[in-house]
């Protein structure tokens, strides 16, 4: 998420991107601070997610593009609301910005979701797989490249900009993936 011109959040889940970002910053001599924010994500997923989340924050949430977000506040609870999720049905992730208000946010969401049948749950692998979303370590890891995943359409090796791994990806494209 790009919160400001000079502030980005990466949702790292169980990946090594935090270490990667630190290594890039050190190797390039960048004047940046890389830290893990005190933020707690809460996902509202499924066919009624939009109704639940809009009943809390308002209809503007329907205008969010997929993977876009907006900062908001509800009952004094600071959050970032993102249109995203691990299901084909879509949903939202609400990033709590003040951990001391976690219980309040939980109760607020559960109350708003009650008329819609909202229940606590967990990530569902089949929903993720049906939605075509990969999970780091389960489906891919640091040794997996986009060509092995069938993501050729997402790789533009003709662009003028240089990026880390461009030469390696050119070689893989030319020789074909090993697996």
Functional labels for PLM-detected ranges:
Residues 2-179:
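Conserved, structured C-terminal
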